[in-house]
Amino acid sequence: EKHAADVLQPDIANAGGITELKKIAAIAESKHITMAPHNVCSPVGAMAEIQLDESLINFEIQEYHAEFYTGHYFTVLDGFTRQKDGYVDLSDAPGLGLELNEREIAKHPPLKKITSSGGTVRGI
């Protein structure tokens, strides 16, 4: 009501997912506030936001940390989009456009537990 913000930067994971972020965007749009979603530094969250961004009238820019998304993201997830020259392409695959590469994931077994019951890191 007081127009204290010109741009909102909600995080899809903390906002409650795609539907909740869409609701936030609709309220922002009614107040002439643009959206610049915060990237959760997760490829799944990034793809969800990128897909949602395309549907937002008040979308301004998407935070995308290309330096975090290195080779392993592109080997364990088929369909994860790469940023090129400041842009990303939308996938036309179903859902978020991602598919787990189970063969690649199997090459990397889970790490053993490295914390004690009190949370102290041990054995590394």
Stretches with model-predicted labels:
Residues E1-Y87, S91-P94:
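Shared catalytic-loop signature of beta/alpha-barrel
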Residues L96-I124:
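Extended hydrophobic packing segments that form well-structured cores
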